Amino acid sequence: MNTRKIQMPREVYIGPDVIYETGEICKDLHLDNKVLVLTGPNTYDIAAKHAIESLENQDIEVDVKIVEKVSYDSVEEVSEMITSGTNVLGVGGGKVIDVAKLASYDKNVFFVSMPTTASHDGIVSPLASIKNPKTSTSAKAHAPIAVIADSKIIANSPFRLLSAGCADLISNFTAIKDWQLAHRLKNESYSESAASLSIMSAKMITDNVDSIKPGLEESARLVVKTLFSSGMAISIAGSSRPASGSEHTFSHALDKILDKPCLHGEQCGVGTILMMYLYGGDWKFIRDSLKAVGAPTSAKELGISDENVIDALTMAHTIRPERYTILGDNGISEDAAYELALKTGVIK
């Protein structure tokens, strides 16, 4: 029987001060025995302590673990803390939520996603990004049973993070082109519904760039809802294909090259300009949309060298070689990479 499982959150809560309802929400979901709260060193004071207080007000037993990084060691360490009857609440950015996903999946318990930023679509997807000694890889996990997104907290986070989330969403445009290309040339499985949802998510950002401003609760709410729909596209597809193509392999190549990589969404945004040019698409529209939401559009704005861009472009096809993209099996030459980056203004 050709059966496929599509995981989605049971409930999603988005709004100002919703964090103070954490205990009631977990109680309603019958996650009221014991909760392991995972958070970061900065997000404890910003958000986690309020969630913990709300849980304790509902007489829910709470353990707390500060997560410093995403690695197999940190996931294993958290997994060992999950005892019978314990569920997981991930409070923070992408790293914390990825550890929550992986550890809860390992122990087959529920987890609740509580993002404090809206910097990428991992807040709801069933996949997690985890670093190994060479690069970041996508690991299978499970979707959260619920998402609690306090739009006031997210609006008060650095605008650069929200801008990066917008750039990550805009990158769906080239991700879908790559997926369609792989479907035509390699007969790769393709989902029209997942692709349509992914493109709709990207258009929600490009159609509303003038509404995305620093400190606005409405801006945070819009981006979170759009990241949610993009994450749902990933769930429907059963892979990250709807939101990850050649622009993401460019970003992952930069991760390998740079001692201190830029934000994931920022790198993907610049990659989208480059890959849209290769497709003969409207790369200027991509560039202008990124500028409108405050995202970088050049090596200089990313704070990296021209050589870093060229190296990443020529290396990108070696990242996830099983995933066919516009870069093909053999990639592009150094001369072609230079011309591409120069013509799009990514380098000067």
UniProtKB/Swiss-Prot annotation:
Annotated positions binding NAD(+): G94, K95, V96, I97, D98, T116, T117, A118, S119, S125
Subcellular location: Cytoplasm
Main localization of the protein described in the UniProt heading: cytoplasm
Metal-binding found in the keyword field: yes
CDD domains: Gro1PDH
One Gene Ontology biological process: phospholipid biosynthetic process
Listed EC numbers: 1.1.1.261
Pathway: Membrane lipid metabolism; glycerophospholipid metabolism
One Pfam family it belongs to: Fe-ADH_2
Domain of life: Archaea
Alphabetized UniProt keyword annotations: Cytoplasm, Lipid biosynthesis, Lipid metabolism, Metal-binding, NAD, NADP, Oxidoreductase, Phospholipid biosynthesis, Phospholipid metabolism, Zinc
EC primary class: oxidoreductase
Gene Ontology MF term list: glycerol-1-phosphate dehydrogenase (NAD+) activity; glycerol-1-phosphate dehydrogenase (NADP+) activity; metal ion binding
Catalytic activity: sn-glycerol 1-phosphate + NAD(+) = dihydroxyacetone phosphate + NADH + H(+); sn-glycerol 1-phosphate + NADP(+) = dihydroxyacetone phosphate + NADPH + H(+)
Subunit description: Homooctamer.
Protein name: Glycerol-1-phosphate dehydrogenase [NAD(P)+]
Organism: Methanobrevibacter smithii (strain ATCC 35061 / DSM 861 / OCM 144 / PS)
